[in-house]
C-alpha cells in the first residue's frame, strides 16, 4: 500500500477564523487580558453610527471592514456635529469603491456618508482611535512576527497619517530605534505583549502582530494576522521570514 505523507499542521483553522474576523480577534485579545483598542460591531447605517458616536462622545474612531486586510476599506473618521473628516485609501469611481495605494482625505459630509455606508453595509467594526506615538519621521506602529511562538522579524512602519501600512508608502525603520525614541523599556513592553498574543494562539507557526504605542509608551495590539510574513529583505539572525519558518519546522534554513 502507498504510504501517506505526514502532514504538519502549521495554522490551526480556528486561529485563522479568529484572526481574519476583526471583531472575534478583538474579543479574543480581551478575553486573554491583552491590551487592544475598544472594538465593537458597527451599526449598518451612517445615521446610526453618527448617533452612536455622538451619544458616546466618541469623536475619533476607525471604521474597518470586519473581514479584510492591507488597509483596504479602513477609514479613520473624525466626527463632530458640525465638522467631519475621513482618511482612507478608498475612493468612489463610477459608484464603485476602489482601493488605491495612497491616502485620501475627505471633508464633505456627502462623500463621507457614501464611503462609510459602503463599508457599513458589508459588515464593519468601530475601533477606538488611539493616537500613535511618533518618531522623527511621523506616527508609527510595529509589525512583529512571531514564528513558532518566538520573537522573529519586526519592523516599524512610519507614516504621515493615521494609517501606516507599508504598501501605502509608509517608511521602514528599525523597530527598536522607533520604540526607543518613545522611551526606555518600551520595546520590552511591546515584545512582552507580543509573547502574550503568541501564547494565546498555541500551535500557530506564523503570527503577524500589528502593535502601536501611545505617547506614554503603552502598547496596544491593533490586529493579528494569520500570516503577515511578507517582509522582503528583513532579517532576524541572518534569516528572512521564510528561512525562519523552515528552520522552525525542520531545524535548517531553506
Regions found by a protein language model. Name each.
Residues 1-52:
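Conserved N-proximal alpha/beta basic substrate-recognition cap immediately N-terminal to
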Residues 43, 67, 130, 148, ...:
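Short, flexible loop/turn elements at secondary-structure junctions
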Residues 56-166:
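Phosphate-binding site of ATP-dependent enzymes
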Residues 128, 155-158, 209-211, 223-226:
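Active-site proximal loops enriched in glycine and acidic residues that flank catalytic Cys/His/Asp
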Amino acid at each position: 500500500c502507498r504510504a501517506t505523507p505526514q502532514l504538519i499542521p502549521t495554522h490551526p483553522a480556528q486561529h485563522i477564523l479568529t484572526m481574519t474576523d476583526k471583531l472575534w480577534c478583538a474579543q479574543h485579545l480581551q478575553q486573554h487580558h491583552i491590551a487592544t483598542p475598544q472594538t465593537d460591531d458597527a451599526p449598518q447605517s451612517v445615521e446610526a453610527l453618527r448617533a452612536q458616536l455622538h451619544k458616546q462622545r466618541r469623536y475619533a474612531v476607525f471604521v474597518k471592514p470586519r473581514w479584510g486586510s492591507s488597509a483596504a476599506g479602513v477609514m479613520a473618521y473624525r466626527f463632530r456635529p458640525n465638522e467631519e473628516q475621513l482618511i482612507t485609501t478608498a475612493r468612489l469611481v463610477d459608484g464603485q469603491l476602489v482601493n488605491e495605494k495612497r491616502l485620501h482625505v475627505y471633508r464633505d459630509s456627502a462623500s463621507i456618508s457614501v464611503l462609510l455606508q459602503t463599508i457599513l453595509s458589508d459588515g464593519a467594526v468601530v475601533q477606538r482611535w488611539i493616537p500613535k506615538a511618533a518618531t522623527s519621521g511621523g506616527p508609527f506602529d510595529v509589525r512583529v512576527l512571531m514564528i513558532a511562538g518566538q520573537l522573529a522579524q519586526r519592523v516599524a512602519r512610519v507614516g504621515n497619517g493615521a494609517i501606516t501600512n507599508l504598501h501605502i508608502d509608509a517608511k521602514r525603520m528599525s523597530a527598536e530605534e522607533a520604540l526607543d525614541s518613545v522611551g526606555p523599556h518600551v520595546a520590552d513592553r511591546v515584545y512582552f505583549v507580543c509573547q502574550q498574543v503568541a501564547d494565546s494562539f498555541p500551535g500557530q507557526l506564523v503570527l503577524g502582530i500589528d502593535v502601536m504605542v501611545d505617547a506614554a509608551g503603552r502598547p496596544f495590539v491593533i490586529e493579528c494576522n494569520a500570516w503577515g510574513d511578507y517582509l522582503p529583505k528583513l532579517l532576524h539572525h541572518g534569516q528572512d521570514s521564510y528561512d525562519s519558518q523552515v528552520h522552525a519546522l525542520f531545524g535548517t534554513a531553506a
